A protein has these predicted regions:
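Redox- and metal-dependent alpha/beta enzyme cores, enriched for Fe-S-associated oxidoreductases
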Residues: 340-356
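Buried hydrophobic packing segments
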Residues: 41, 112-122, 151, 272-276, ...
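Zn-dependent metallopeptidase/amidohydrolase metal-coordination segment
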Residues: 2, 322, 375-454
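A short beta-alpha structural unit
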Residues: 59, 292-296, 315-320, 329-336, ...
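Midchain, well-structured core segments that form catalytic/ion-binding scaffolds
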Residues: 142, 148-335
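Active-site metal-coordination/substrate-binding segment of hydrolases
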Residues: 70-137, 143, 155, 427-439
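Acidic/His- and Gly-rich active-site-bordering loop/insert found
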Residues: 1-103, 127-129
Length: 461
């Protein structure tokens, strides 16, 4: 029954989250959409035979089994904004072309509900739960993980567990993540003037659209527009513009990607500002192009670093300019060879002579590393290999961040995997193929059984 029912429930979950998710409501601190989604998932879990608890709308869980140790499977129901360019409506859960389409089908509603049904499959098979198993559903992973902070304030921590919110075969390390803002007040020089600029929806995604308005300020508007168009076209950047008197309004298009891998996207903000070089003479444009530009590894910003797991990832996720005031918000993923203090000081040192700019640390989430030869990593790794036959893929260090960093003895495990086409997250047309869903389900059934049976930790936090 569990194996037959999962597809419809994943589609239902995609429909349950709507655009109201950011507005807090009674019983739902993260918005009506997240509140509805959490209540829906818990009602499904209760019907499946789980004990369920709603923790004040911050998160909830479905539990089965008895015992001292508590095994956690920690997923999230919140999603990043849907953006434009979808083939099918992003909250329809449309079953088309052999896939379920919708925001969150892969990140992370789909894997969360697949995990619930994997445990249900073990229940139906008569598996002996000699430990408590708790499938936890958070509602604020994408914008701060306040849900898990609340969980840890009111509930016991898990003894060990996984977060189905990354990739296979298994994640043994997550890099430190931080967010920095460069803000200030810009002075204009002669020539065309930047009136406003807006780009990005969330800080942890590569922005695929940026809008800006330029005033010709005595120059020929058509000439100003042509210069900007030429610069954008030179970099193969799609754009549209309209001239309204002395003002030229541009919409610049990039390619969305997860903020942890900015090299896979095309940052609409960075290319929009680059196109203003030589057209608009002000501090904001000069500073952006001199120290950030289209670089994604902090080469010009004074924070470049790398180690055996790769280079630092530096993503401008949000940018706003109006009335001379500017804000550039940057999300970064750090190699283990550096830390937030070193990075922050490097940026401050680089910008020390820019008196109009101030650097502010907005947030930090420290990474972690677990021995890839540890029992837990090897149990998960071997379960993946046994089900898939993939003996080439190795445990991974990821620039992404998951709930795993909120707990001790917790790692990310799936769902992204080789052999099932492109698994798109944080972009239009996110979808989970039925073939991939079946494979993920079978991996989780095997891995969760082994995780419960073959791994043990002291339950102290």
């Amino acid at each position: 029954a569990a194996r037959r029912g999962g597809r419809k429930k994943i589609a239902g979950l995609c429909c349950a989250v709507d655009k109201k998710r950011f507005h807090a409501v009674l019983g739902g601190p993260f918005g009506q959409g997240n509140k509805d989604c959490l209540e829906y998932v818990l009602s499904v879990a209760e019907q499946l035979g789980f004990r369920t608890v709603n923790l004040d709308g911050y998160c909830g869980y479905a539990e089965i089994g008895e015992g001292k140790e508590l095994v956690g499977i920690v997923g999230h129901l919140d999603v990043v904004p849907e953006g434009d360019g979808w083939k099918y409506p992003p909250y329809s859960g449309a079953l088309e072309e052999g896939a379920i389409w919708g925001r969150g089908t892969i990140d992370d509603k789909g894997p969360a509900i697949i995990s619930l049904y994997a445990i249900k499959a073990l229940m139906d098979d008569g598996f002996k739960f000699n430990k408590r198993v708790r499938v936890i559903f958070g509602c604020n992973e994408e914008t701060g993980s306040l849900c898990m902070k609340h969980y840890l304030e009111v509930e016991e921590p898990i003894s060990y567990g996984v977060s189905p919110d990354s990739e296979f075969p298994v994640i043994f390390a997550e890099k430190t993540i931080n967010s920095v803002e460069i803000k200030g007040e810009s002075t204009d020089g002669k020539g065309a003037k930047l009136v406003s600029l807006d780009g990005g929806i969330v800080i942890n995604a590569v922005p695929d659209i940026c809008t800006l308005t330029v005033n010709a300020n005595g120059e020929n508007p058509a000439d100003v527009a042509q210069k900007i168009c030429d610069a954008l076209s030179k970099n193969n950047i799609e754009h549209e513009y309209a001239v309204h008197g002395d003002e030229i309004r541009f919409t610049v298009h990039g390619k969305a990607a997860h903020g942890s891998v900015p090299q896979l996207g095309v940052n609409a903000i960075s290319y929009a500002v680059a196109a203003l070089d030589g057209v608009v003479n002000n501090d904001f444009v000069r500073i952006y192009n001199a120290y950030i530009s289209t670089c994604v590894h902090g080469e010009k910003l004074g924070c470049f670093a790398e180690d055996e797991y790769g280079k630092i990832a530096v993503n401008v996720g949000l940018c706003h300019y109006e009335n001379g005031k500017f804000s550039i918000k940057i999300n970064s993923r750090l190699p283990f060879s550096t830390d937030t203090k070193t990075m922050f000081n490097g940026i401050k040192s680089t910008l020390k002579n820019e008196v109009c700019a101030k650097v502010v640390l907005l947030s930090e989430s420290e990474g972690f590393k677990i021995d890839p030869d540890s029992d837990m990593i090897q149990v998960l790794y071997n379960a993946y290999r046994e089900v898939t036959g993939d003996v080439e893929s190795k445990p991974v260090c990821t620039p992404g961040g998951t709930y795993a960093r909120e707990f001790n003895n917790c790692v990310a495990f799936g769902p992204e995997m080789k052999g099932y086409g492109e698994m798109i997250i944080h972009q239009p047309n996110e979808r989970l193929t039925l073939e991939a869903m079946k494979a993920i389900f079978e991996i989780y059934v095997k891995a969760y059984a082994d995780l419960i049976d073959k791994v043990s930790f002291d339950s102290k936090k």
